[in-house]
Amino acid sequence: ASVVADAYIKGLRGYDIETLWEALKHGANAHLRGTASGRLGYESYNQLGYVANNIGIGQNVARTLEYAYNDWAIYTLGKKLGKPESEIDIYKKHALNYKNVYHPERKLMVGKDNKGVFNPNFDAVDWSGEFCEGNSWHWSFCVFHDPQGLINLMGGKKEFNAMMDSVFVIPG
């Protein structure tokens, strides 16, 4: 979604944007079994606002953060295409789903089960399980579409900067 939105917004043309638009919307609400297409865990994501960590789907926090970013991209593209708010508002709402895996005491992204309970065995430097190619310290800053929202969530600029500085000294 982000590649298509970025290309269109930058003025790159030569493709059927309406077909791509429909494909982006479909991909945000489907997972073709046995393929890498669509969103694994989309049912949980759409219902709960995050991919739950107890439904047999790994990398659930990473998926939640990536899906939120892609929803922002879909929303942004929809606005550029002049799509009605009734069609794109759900993507604007889902773009904020990153907040649903934010643990306010830890100031990090942490997995939750389908009852809304944060992972009691959370390990901030674990590269497996709830994350992919990184750990909670890395992924907690993957809110590229709403940096001010993340800064506010972490308690303001001072707290955000302290957390960001910690990424460079935490082992793992």
Identify the role of each PLM range:
Residues 4-6, 13:
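Buried, small/hydrophobic-residue-enriched core segments of structured protein domains
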Residues 11-96, 100-172:
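Active-site core of glycosidic bond-cleaving carbohydrate-active enzymes
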